[in-house]
A protein has these predicted regions:
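Glycoside hydrolase catalytic-domain context in secreted enzymes
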Residues: 1-209
């Protein structure tokens, strides 16, 4: 799943688990083991439990969704932090740094390497279902807070991930909608937090939208 187009002899080495966020190391290719967790308001639990565990399903709009990786008792526990928008309301990057410090500490305790956060999309829609993940509607503030969190996480030798690149400002049809944004607006608003994360935060990875 994580190595698209992987050679057949490599595929069996991928982890047999539910959640699928972890990538086993492949010594022959010099690839270390990477254990990935979701965010952004704390660790997304273990995200990977044994495939032998009976599935736990949730009915989501008529579709059965396997939520075993998030609900089974073997999934690691972590602190549920306040919303990112709440942290941004402080207008204080020290708050975001403290946020990242807690996350980084718990990642080390749980032997996790990659944090799929911070989220730096803008709260363009008041009813956006994921506004709690983002630092509000101001791109500069979002960038400042993201940089502080990234630095705190990566100071512990971990990998931060700026997401979702770019213009991922709505949930409805987000996997199929075509976003058309004026070039100036794109650069001044939607790209700014990502640019700051790369230039100022030296973020180690980026998640595409």
């Amino acid at each position: 799943q994580q190595l698209t187009g992987a050679l057949p002899e490599i595929v069996p080495e991928l982890p047999h688990c539910k959640g699928g966020r972890h990538v086993s190391g492949i010594a022959a290719l010099g690839i270390p083991t990477l254990r990935v967790t979701n965010g952004p308001v704390g660790l997304g639990q273990n995200d990977c439990v044994s495939a032998s565990i009976p599935p736990i399903y949730f009915n989501l709009g008529g579709e059965r969704v396997d939520i075993t990786a998030y609900t089974d008792a073997s999934s690691a526990k972590a602190t549920a932090l306040p919303s990112a928008m709440g942290a941004a309301a402080s207008f204080d990057p020290a708050v975001a740094a403290a946020y990242g410090d807690v996350i980084g500490t718990e990642m080390l305790n749980l032997a996790l390497h990659v944090f799929e956060a911070p989220g730096m999309n803008l709260s363009r829609l008041p009813i956006l279902g994921r506004n709690f993940e983002y630092f509000g509607e101001d791109p500069y503030l979002a960038g400042v807070m993201s940089v502080a969190e990234i630095k705190a996480v990566q100071a512990k030798g971990l990998i931060g991930m700026a997401k979702h690149f770019v213009a991922n400002e709505q949930e409805t049809n987000r996997t199929t909608v075509q976003e058309t944004v004026d070039r100036q607006v794109l650069r001044e608003l939607y790209l700014l937090p990502f640019e700051m994360s790369v230039k100022d935060g030296k973020v180690a990875s980026i998640m595409c939208a």
